[in-house]
Amino acid sequence: MSEKFFEIFEKKLEKLKEQNLYRSVKDMESRHGMEITIQGKKYINFASNDYLGLSQHPLVKEAGIDAIKTFGAGGGASRLLSGGTILHRKLEELLSEFKNTESCLILNSGYTANTSLIPALAGENDIIFSDELNHASIIDGCRLSRAEKIIYKHADIEDLKKLIRNISCKGKKVIITDTVFSMDGDIAPIRELYELCKAEGALLYIDDAHGTGVLGNGYGILKHLGLQTEAFVIQMGTLSKAIGVFGAFVCGDSSIIDWFINSARGFIFSTSLPPSTVASAYASLKIIMEDKELIKRLWQNIEKVMEIIKNLELKTTKTQTPIIPILFENIEQAIKASRILYDSGIYAPVIRPPTVKTPRIRITITAGHSDNDIEKLSGALTLLNSIF
């Protein structure tokens, strides 16, 4: 019987390979700045979400090492048992200050956050309105919720208005969106969503994973748009992208955060983040709040690469962020393009269905990229352009 089960999986994998949809893991042997080594060969990494390069900042690494010396390597238990430390509390207080909210809770990953917080926030008799291009973790969080789910067209505020105004709801209406869409790099119409929630008495749950540390001088989407923090806005974000470490957080009204502590299953039933991770995230966040040079450098690099893309007339999206996709007509072209970049010393893997509808190379820019790195990327993209 077990052999038959294995055959089922083998056939499924074979089908993925035939369709060029099979994925495999490539592991780094070392990393120095934006230079990585894979199977003995060095590449410039243009596939990292470490937008400010803070994962390798000396103060961030030192903070983690010091925490291990004081608290050990692991959390040991959930926060509701004995897994919490003063470091966890200090990070939550700093994140509350950073996002200008009453309270904050840290969780173990962005995926854990969305699949735990959304079911805790919206349940029976509630209605969720979710952007059609929201991250997989939001989609899965909505599926786990007992609320009714309504999908609106991507970033289409008029479509959402029609939907939200033409449906009756016994409970809460909750609008959920990424702020920056991770595969296209575009920004959601947050100002319009904010005003719509105000008018309709709805909650606004925003996933600012790719906006935190990048937009609004580092403070995220609300600061970027000059919007005030309000009780109806719940701000989720991650510690793993611009902050450069690992984990996630949610900031908002103290009563909502307290409810999450008591009902978000991914928080209640998970061992806490290691103290070293928390200490490193705290050090990183302090750098973002106090030193704006890295953010300035990031945006300078984004402008340089966007100019290269424009001059080469490569097909891209309406990106407004460090995420710069190069689009291709089919999977075969995208795979070939990724190999050309790979052979040129540029690490930028192909993104294929079902992650996205249109195959692409997703280039991400960081403050850690040097002028030489960008020049090397320019040469590789020029070669790419001559072939396609």
From Swiss-Prot:
Q: Name one GO biological process term.
A: biotin biosynthetic process
Query: GO molecular-function annotation terms?
Result: 8-amino-7-oxononanoate synthase activity; pyridoxal phosphate binding
**Does the UniProt entry include the keyword 4Fe-4S?**
no
Top-level enzyme category: transferase
Substrates-to-products reaction catalysed: 6-carboxyhexanoyl-[ACP] + L-alanine + H(+) = (8S)-8-amino-7-oxononanoate + holo-[ACP] + CO2
Q: What Enzyme Commission number does this protein have?
A: 2.3.1.47
Signal peptide bounds: none
One Pfam family name from the record? Aminotran_1_2
Indicate where the modification N6-(pyridoxal phosphate)lysine is found in the sequence.
241
- Where, in this chain's numbering, is substrate bound? 23, 135, 355
Q: To which pathway does this protein belong? A: Cofactor biosynthesis; biotin biosynthesis
Cofactor field:
pyridoxal 5'-phosphate
What residues bind pyridoxal 5'-phosphate, as annotated?
110-111, 182, 207-210, 238-241
Disulfide bond is among the record's keywords = no
Q: Name the domain of life.
A: Bacteria
What keywords would UniProt list here?
Answer: Biotin biosynthesis, Pyridoxal phosphate, Transferase
Q: How does the record describe its quaternary structure?
A: Homodimer.
Q: What does this protein do?
A: Catalyzes the decarboxylative condensation of pimeloyl-[acyl-carrier protein] and L-alanine to produce 8-amino-7-oxononanoate (AON), [acyl-carrier protein], and carbon dioxide.
Q: Which family does it belong to?
A: Belongs to the class-II pyridoxal-phosphate-dependent aminotransferase family. BioF subfamily.
This chain belongs to the protein called Putative 8-amino-7-oxononanoate synthase
Q: Which organism is it from?
A: Thermodesulfovibrio yellowstonii (strain ATCC 51303 / DSM 11347 / YP87)
Lineage, highest ranks first:
Bacteria, Pseudomonadati, Nitrospirota, Thermodesulfovibrionia, Thermodesulfovibrionales
